[in-house]
Amino acid sequence: MPPPETMFCAQQINIPPELPDILKQFTKAAIRTQPHDLLQWSAAYFDSLSKGEPLPVKDRVELQVATQKTDSGLTPGLLKVLNKQLSSKMSVKIADLKQKWTDLCLPEEQLQNILGLDNFQDDIDWLKFLSLGCSALGGSISSALKYACEILTEDPEGGAAHIPFDTFTYIYKYLAHIDGDISEMQIEDVLNVLQSEAERQNGLIQPRNFLSSQCPLLS
């Protein structure tokens, strides 16, 4: 005969006072992020919360971008989440990147396609991976640079999306190198024009500058 179930009264059940707020914040985060696999994402969420690490949470709900073939692929919002989680280190281990990628329920094949664009070893320059991620989102170099500005900027949401000119230069030169068809002369022509713009903007550049008809073609 099985032993009787232990019964507890309300006074014996200790509910942490912060639990309702934790669950409320978790629910809001899940709604904003819309994870493809809620169980997997939830485990990553509470693991990050317990360690005091940046959470795998989007800033807001976002619509599917036109370049996505499915609703489970990389989006600007998810790339921004990865940047928050990994950008504190200039160099990131591929194993750590894969874990964060998996936590966001992103397809392994897409990660391998991005990594395959360069000869990465065990460690990755984070800004290089971010650049390639932006390229995967945008298709063209100008679109990739626009995404990079929107992800890296400290401006308010919907603002001008300024980033330091040095950061822009690094990303542009790297993507031009990966492209392979952009001459050094073309790169220098672009940077010379944009440097003049940056000098008038406290060393910052914004998408409006390189998308302007006054700027030479980026590619």
UniProtKB/Swiss-Prot annotation:
Transmembrane segments: none annotated. It comes from the Eukaryota. Keywords: Cell projection, Cilium, Flagellum. Its main location: other. InterPro entries: ROP_DD. Belongs to the ropporin family. Functions as part of axonemal radial spoke complexes that play an important part in the motility of sperm and cilia. Important for male fertility. Involved in fibrous sheath integrity and sperm motility, plays a role in PKA-dependent signaling processes required for spermatozoa capacitation. Residues 17-54 form the RIIa domain. It is found in: Cell projection, Cilium, Flagellum; Cell projection, Cilium. Disulfide bonds: none annotated. This is Ropporin-1-like protein. Component of axonemal radial spoke complexes. It comes from Xenopus laevis. One of its GO terms (cellular component) is radial spoke.
